[in-house]
Amino acid sequence: MLSALAYESWILHALIWLPLLGTFHVLWAAEDRAKWLALRWSLVVFVLSVGLWWAYDPALGGGYQLTSSLPWIAVWGVNYALGLDGISLFMVLLSTFTTPLAILGSFNYIKKRQKAFYALMLLLEVGVVGVFSAVDLFLFYVFFELTLVPMYFIIGIWGGERRVYAAIKFFLYTAFGSLLMLVGILYIYARGKALLGVTSFAFVDLLQIPLTPQEQMWLFGAFALAFAIKVPIFPFHTWLPDAHVEAPTPGSVVLAAVLLKMGTYGFVRFLLPFFPLAARHPNVVTLMLTLGVIGIIYAAWVAAVQPDAKKLVAYTSVAHMGFVVIGIFALNVNGLQGGLLVMISHGISTGALFLLIGMLYERRHTRLIKEFGGIGRVAPWLATAFVITALVSIGLPGTSGFVGEFLTLLGVFENHPGVGILATSGVIFAAYYMLPMVQSVFFNALEKPENREVRDLSRREVVILAPMIALMIVIGVHPTPLLRRMEPSVQMVLERVYAAAPPSAALIESVQEETVETVERVE
């Protein structure tokens, strides 16, 4: 049926252009219709994206599928080129799945400037889907930067008391990293033109450029810093707690579920295949594993002393992303697949936790853990949803959190057992900071009169949480369909890392001579 509709030829364009059309539709409509229009547009995008699960065929190998390319800026060799592999497939699905749930979760929260807010949410979806589906480096950078604008305004306008500070900090951190990446992109483009006579930003063309080990190391640093800030990993994480605490609930959901994944996706998409000699250099591997482990342990201990439930969950993101980083730089199939599964599980579970904390805030107008107690007695379904999601975040067997962390640790233990032992302690620390919060909020004595008035989940809230909880359990029980789709692409990335050899001086000289001869013939 999908082939009869020529689904592969237009779907990725639709997933980008439909929310963009929705953005203008929301701005044009009446204020009281904005949230419903945004929800409808995002649901249409999600329903269309579901077909990607069947359209992508892992039997065809780990390369890009559903590709399409349109000329954009021909003089620079820039194309509007889109495609998916077994890595980006899940990031696109996570983005389209999370956006309508975040929008639906905002209905009781966003009261002012609704048209602007929901237009920005749809524009944010345009950016994140574009980041994960672009196969042209210039186009990737455009979408990467585009996501910065709507999130800045979402935090700065609809956030908490310190929203302006948090928004500016978020903007400056990520913009600085992006500028370094831009320098790296321009350098790669210039080297491709000088060495191969290629004027193209297409991934497949740029991968052919014979960069020296020194060039790869410097470019790795430029790209790695940009993505490390976006993840964020220790010590570039300080913008994240402020952004999460001050952002409105739907902003926190999208930030945790999707935007942070842009950084770790960048690690896999660019650092490993584009700069393989740097990526597998022992000093680089040691540095990245060390930063990942420090992030896991440090974030766990800081989370354990947080009085604010939302800030506690914000620090869990730093810990989970630490697991992703060590999985990626284990440089083996188990570690890389585990890191990708942690990305997916974290996106769903942490997004759900922020929604649940937002629901508690709507009822009690506080996020301080000490102000709660005994909520499970008056709101049993709310308590049940929170407990399940917290257990997923900890990594309980039978949930998506366990599968990802298990594979990650398995991959790390293969090559770096010392790092694996330290990282395993992070699983224990996760229980140390998460379970006391659950105990304090839901199962301590029901003493405060305000807590007796807390209502249970509404139908709208059940509709939001049910698919998230179901997906976390389904992935935990039966992860094979996900692993089968991502494994060929993971294998292809790792083959590129280990097959790469430093280009000899003779090779570079011969390439340059051929380029000069070609230019002379043309003249």
Regions found by a protein language model. Name each.
Residues 13-28, 40-54, 92-106, 124-125, ...:
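Central hydrophobic cores of alpha-helical transmembrane segments in multi-pass inner-membrane proteins
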Residues 22-31, 99-111, 153-162, 231-245, ...:
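C-terminal ends of transmembrane helices
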Residues 31-45, 109-123, 135-141, 159-180, ...:
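Membrane-interfacial loop-to-helix junctions in multi-pass inner-membrane proteins
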Residues 57-79, 179-237, 242, 267-287, ...:
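Juxtamembrane/interfacial segments at transmembrane-helix boundaries in multi-pass membrane proteins
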Residues 116-123, 127-215, 229, 302-315, ...:
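Alpha-helical multi-pass transmembrane bundles of energy-transducing inner-membrane proteins
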